[in-house]
Amino acid sequence: MERALLILKPDAVQRGLIGAIISRFEQRGLKFQGLKLMQVDEALARRHYAEHEGKSFFEGLVKYITSAPVVVAVVAGKPGTVELVRTMVGATNPAKAAPGTIRGDFGVDIGRNLIHASDSPESGERETAIFFQPHELIGDWNRTLDGWIYE
């Protein structure tokens, strides 16, 4: 199964949007393999966003993601899951995100864009390993409704 890491950022948690956002992924048929509320510390934030180090927005991003609790989740599905998740999340800038996407429906500002999602299957695996220990994940568990979602 292909996996993507999701981070419901501090603005999503503070605005009480956890349930509304999580339910979209469930309703789409994706399986949650891990889900937790946590406070990201500076070291973890820098590790996760290492590819952006040196960019003008990096320090602000670290400060923001560590400012309040976040919800971190791993969703899994058939090949193409990461692309599907990215489509559901919408454009980085909520002002340019299509209606029907998470950012298009709930977002207002690029600096408070609600959610992070892995941008490739490789990133999904790398990011999952940053936030979850293997024992915290439930692998390929069976749901009775899977036959109604996947051929």
UniProtKB/Swiss-Prot annotation:
UniProt keywords (A-Z) are: ATP-binding, Cytoplasm, Kinase, Magnesium, Metal-binding, Nucleotide metabolism, Nucleotide-binding, Phosphoprotein, Transferase
Chief subcellular location:
cytoplasm
Say yes or no: keyword Nucleotide-binding present.
yes
Binding, ATP: 9, 57, 86, 92, 103, 113
Cellular localisation: Cytoplasm
Q: Which InterPro entries match?
A: NDK-like_dom, NDK-like_dom_sf, Nucleoside_diP_kinase, Nucleoside_diP_kinase_AS
Which residues does the Swiss-Prot or TrEMBL record annotate as the active site? 116 (pros-phosphohistidine intermediate)
Q: Which GO terms describe its molecular function?
A: ATP binding; metal ion binding; nucleoside diphosphate kinase activity
Described function = Major role in the synthesis of nucleoside triphosphates other than ATP. The ATP gamma phosphate is transferred to the NDP beta phosphate via a ping-pong mechanism, using a phosphorylated active-site intermediate.
Subunit details: Homotetramer.
Which family would the database say this protein is a member of?
A: Belongs to the NDK family.
State what protein this is by name: Nucleoside diphosphate kinase
Species source reads Chloroflexus aggregans (strain MD-66 / DSM 9485)
Q: Read off the lineage from the record.
A: Bacteria, Bacillati, Chloroflexota, Chloroflexia, Chloroflexales
Q: Which gene encodes it?
A: ndk
